[in-house]
């Protein structure tokens, strides 16, 4: 691979890391809203907890995909 293609691979990996930043912000916002909901209505904590765990797992898969793509771009696409 020439230097231009390697540079493009690094740019793509950097963009994938920016996507992971967005996932982290989204998970933080989701956690804040679930804590806020529990503070307002403590009786439904088990229902909110199960929904939050499911949504966090779905969100985290996006971060894992971006991380795997970044690793592949940096180490495999040489």
Swiss-Prot record:
Membrane topology: Multi-pass membrane protein
Main location: membrane
Any matching Pfam family: ATP-synt_C
Keywords associated with the record: ATP synthesis, Cell membrane, CF(0), Hydrogen ion transport, Ion transport, Lipid-binding, Membrane, Transmembrane, Transmembrane helix, Transport
Cross-referenced CDD domains: ATP-synt_Fo_c_NaATPase (cd18184)
GO cellular component: plasma membrane; proton-transporting ATP synthase complex; proton-transporting two-sector ATPase complex, proton-transporting domain
Chain ranges passing through the membrane: 9-29, 56-76
Site (Reversibly protonated during proton transport): 60
GO molecular function, one term: proton-transporting ATP synthase activity, rotational mechanism
Cellular location(s): Cell membrane
Listed InterPro entries: ATP_synth_csu_bac/chlpt, ATP_synth_F0_csu, ATP_synth_F0_csu_DDCD_BS, ATPase_proteolipid_c-like_dom, F/V-ATP_Csub_sf
Entry similarity comment: Belongs to the ATPase C chain family.
Summary of the function given for this chain in its UniProt record: F(1)F(0) ATP synthase produces ATP from ADP in the presence of a proton or sodium gradient. F-type ATPases consist of two structural domains, F(1) containing the extramembraneous catalytic core and F(0) containing the membrane proton channel, linked together by a central stalk and a peripheral stalk. During catalysis, ATP synthesis in the catalytic domain of F(1) is coupled via a rotary mechanism of the central stalk subunits to proton translocation. Key component of the F(0) channel; it plays a direct role in translocation across the membrane. A homomeric c-ring of between 10-14 subunits forms the central stalk rotor element with the F(1) delta and epsilon subunits.
Self-association state and partner proteins as the record states: F-type ATPases have 2 components, F(1) - the catalytic core - and F(0) - the membrane proton channel. F(1) has five subunits: alpha(3), beta(3), gamma(1), delta(1), epsilon(1). F(0) has three main subunits: a(1), b(2) and c(10-14). The alpha and beta chains form an alternating ring which encloses part of the gamma chain. F(1) is attached to F(0) by a central stalk formed by the gamma and epsilon chains, while a peripheral stalk is formed by the delta and b chains.
PANTHER family for this protein: ATP SYNTHASE LIPID-BINDING PROTEIN, MITOCHONDRIAL (PTHR10031), ATPASE PROTEIN 9 (PTHR10031:SF0)
HAMAP family: ATP_synth_c_bact (MF_01396)
UniProt-recorded name of the protein: ATP synthase subunit c
Gene responsible for this protein: atpE
